């Protein structure tokens, strides 16, 4: 994505430079090129998974989450967030903020395709995992739009053997099909440890595969 595209479409592409401080911190991440690298990137649900490495101690996990981000921001900063690490696997969580900001699903998917194809063009053997948007108390009113986006993400992932779709939506609902309130901190949007433990049930088999 070019700077001119962003400047000419401010409603479609939120300012990526608002993440400058976080990007500078991510640039300082130390990693071992002699050990397989697994990158988790995306918005605050990734950024706030502070102890993710403790979940998968036998793997080199690199967390490049940046809170409040949208798929277009990930595309803009892809070199720092993903490509520089030459990863074997990339887990991507975006779309949550995109829908909340009113971005149309076709635009979100266009940006998703660009992100995935940019990774695949440089690292054709890299496995790319698209994590579904999660349900939350704060954004439960957007569940229909999230459901439509998740369907599109799943279909897109199914088109390539090196892509996967990680459905965290379903496991975060209770027996009545409503989001489980015990999985969130007070804001009703971000998860507590119980929420991440639920995510682990979906993500672990992919990490270990």
Which residues make up each language-model segment?
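Oxyanion-hole/transition-state-stabilizing segment in secreted/luminal serine hydrolases
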Residues: 46-55, 60, 71-109, 129, ...
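Conserved beta-strand scaffold positions in the cores of enzyme catalytic domains, especially
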Residues: 40, 61-63, 165
């Amino acid at each position: 994505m070019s700077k001119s595209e962003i400047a000419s479409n401010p409603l479609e592409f939120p300012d990526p430079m608002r993440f400058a401080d976080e990007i500078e911190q991510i640039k300082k991440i130390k990693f071992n090129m002699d050990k397989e690298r697994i990158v988790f990137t995306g918005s605050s649900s990734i950024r706030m998974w502070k102890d993710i490495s403790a979940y998968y101690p036998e793997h080199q996990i690199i967390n490049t989450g940046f809170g409040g981000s949208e798929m277009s921001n990930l595309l803009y900063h892809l070199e720092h967030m993903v490509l520089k690490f030459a990863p074997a696997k990339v887990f991507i969580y975006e779309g949550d903020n995109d829908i909340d900001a009113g971005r149309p699903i076709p635009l979100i998917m266009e940006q998703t395709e660009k992100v995935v194809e940019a990774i695949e063009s440089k690292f054709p053997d890299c496995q790319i995992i698209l994590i579904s948007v999660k349900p939350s108390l704060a954004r439960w009113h957007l569940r229909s739009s999230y459901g439509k986006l998740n369907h599109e993400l799943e279909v897109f992932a199914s088109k390539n053997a090196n892509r996967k779709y990680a459905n965290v939506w379903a496991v975060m609902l209770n027996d009545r099909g409503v989001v489980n309130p015990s999985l969130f901190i007070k804001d009703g949007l971000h998860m507590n440890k119980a929420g991440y433990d639920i995510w682990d049930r979906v993500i672990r088999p992919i990490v270990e595969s």
